[in-house]
From Swiss-Prot:
Pfam families: Ebola-like_HR1-HR2, Filo_glycop. It comes from Reston ebolavirus (strain Reston-89). Residues 55-202 are annotated as: Receptor-binding. The signal peptide region modulates GP's high mannose glycosylation, thereby determining the efficiency of the interactions with DC-SIGN(R). N-glycosylated. This is Envelope glycoprotein.
Amino acid sequence: MGSGYQLLQLPRERFRKTSFLVWVIILFQRAISMPLGIVTNSTLKATEIDQLVCRDKLSSTSQLKSVGLNLEGNGIATDVPSATKRWGFRSGVPPKVVSYEAGEWAENCYNLEIKKSDGSECLPLPPDGVRGFPRCRYVHKVQGTGPCPGDLAFHKNGAFFLYDRLASTVIYRGTTFAEGVVAFLILSEPKKHFWKATPAHEPVNTTDDSTSYYMTLTLSYEMSNFGGNESNTLFKVDNHTYVQLDRPHTPQFLVQLNETLRRNNRLSNSTGRLTWTLDPKIEPDVGEWAFWETKKNFSQQLHGENLHFQILSTHTNNSSDQSPAGTVQGKISYHPPANNSELVPTDSPPVVSVLTAGRTEEMSTQGLTNGETITGFTANPMTTTIAPSPTMTSEVDNNVPSEQPNNTASIEDSPPSASNETIYHSEMDPIQGSNNSAQSPQTKTTPAPTTSPMTQDPQETANSSKPGTSPGSAAGPSQPGLTINTVSKVADSLSPTRKQKRSVRQNTANKCNPDLYYWTAVDEGAAVGLAWIPYFGPAAEGIYIEGVMHNQNGLICGLRQLANETTQALQLFLRATTELRTYSLLNRKAIDFLLQRWGGTCRILGPSCCIEPHDWTKNITDEINQIKHDFIDNPLPDHGDDLNLWTGWRQWIPAGIGIIGVIIAIIALLCICKILC
């Protein structure tokens, strides 16, 4: 009996041990999640209490960042003549500086060095710690003179001048800046790599590296009467060749124009000054603001082969040899091709493919290093693969005095053919002065290329100079032709990667940038969510009498047109919810600051202080992407096709898998209980 009793008691002992272990686990779990009453150390900070009480819940505002947003995202004119009209001088207004944590990548930045008529400087030097804006695609460097009627240069529309994580109300001399405002956005947490130390002067300007994907290109200008009602702006091709800018234009136009002048050998000689003017028929608004990508509408693209260079007049100067030999004025006219419809593919209406001889991003910056201006281009012998178009002609005034540079060129017309042809540009000799013999004309054989002029480095030039080889083919499959996608993708606009290709809407009348790329002191990434707070700028304090706060309407251009008309209602709903979430975080941050003396909000309220305003941005964004994917990218499914994996009898596969999983879990639980008991 005794042995039988012990055998009967053995399972009960095991059960007691198992029960004891379970109770220990339960008590240990409750001890970890004990209410705030056990925290008696009054020296704890609010953030530490939040970590004890709220743990994984959203209780901090670390994701709320002050971001410098560029005004160019709203589609404002970025050319130098238009931009300088937004700046003015004032006296008696002290400058103000505001710091921000993250900045947006800028397409156009500016760098000014202006002097008065007496030689004194118009702009002050930057204070200690103020560095230039580090993320610029084009830097417009302006040198010139002006009356400068005031002490400091402010923004007439009440915006900031954005520098490296500092936004100032004034322009500093020789320091690169971008126009913008400061707003609050909910940004993703930066990626922290334990093996990578943070440099002392972050963000590192990646444009210093010539191999970087983002590479800065400097455009030089000369301006007179800066700050006055009527200013004169000249685009500087080299030290003696300029182009008169009399209407708005894009930086892509200036890059193409520079290369066209150099390839056609239309530069001034070493002692003369040549100023070109643009014919009214030329459209300088080629290309569209597409953020780091030179996306051009083919019908608006500038074709250097259709440009006509004509010398208008020559004014000689009978001074010493050290002075300029003469000032030459020329006119650039444009005869557009008759029809380019044969170059547009008909199989894919939403996509227009344009082949260019080189990489998409680096077509205008090949062979350049950071800090090198557009005037540093050289006329190297090169080969360009072109598509057929109407034959080109060149008109040059024959009544040109001998003092002017000999820029004539004879061209042999050849009929267009169905296949691509290759042009061999002979090396251009330096232009001779007025006392030297005339330069012999060079001969070109071309059917009028349709690709834009571009600059290549010597290595690519050597590879492309082989007969039958085009630069585009030499670049390999990793360097495809330029493609314009007219369907905007919401996925790209909400969570893009750093080097991801962009898409542009077909009807971008205001040239609005639909994406938001930002840089921080630690990492770069994409903005998470659409939460934003109305920006603040210096004009909010009423210190300006010129201009109005018109930047407020469409601050981010309707949040940069993140979706098309079919998802507009969903976008507005998302914006409203994220705004409420942002304001809640701001209020919580203010309350934490006020109650920090008594230990913080959680010390007073206990666990009820844990707020968790969920961010459903990704879910709503996925729905938007799914809508666009269903109705644009994919055709409607055929419900009659029983071969679909999730139709017919196959629709029971997920249910069967779930049932089998439940059965396996029950069997495993029974086995565990059998072993323990």
